[in-house]
């Protein structure tokens, strides 16, 4: 769940509304609490974060608060060892649900013209988990990666299912373009 946080800029005059997620990793033997990067609160952003200006607030009110900065899958947490594979994939699933809910809202509100929607989930999982399915990858760990050997393939299957669902919701004579900014291959 998102936790609203407030940063006082000028005491009693000005503050910044933000949000963060907290993930209790461990209590003992060492206390470990992960805090997501601080995000502008889309319900009350300090500055415009969407066009039109009020759209982020509308989307947040319709679907819930959401990530407003960086890569929500938080690849840096995995790279730096803050997340293990399981933590990362839990984060991926949470972000995926958030994005899907937003897309459903956007698609249901769409009345014509051009709609572009970016799903970064597959890209981020491919960057971070390709090693799990590639025994020749220099970062491959046969024990730690074994449960995640299908992580990339599972994202493709999910994307394919999602495209099918989307096609079923589109009116006749609508063109759907699915594209990628790049592909992936072994190390």
How would you describe each model-predicted region?
Residues 1-142:
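His/Asp/Glu-rich, glycine-adjacent segments
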Residues 147-152:
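Extracellular loop and loop/strand-boundary signature of outer-membrane beta-barrel proteins
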Residues 154-187:
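Metal-dependent active-site segment of extracytoplasmic phospho-/sulfohydrolases and closely related
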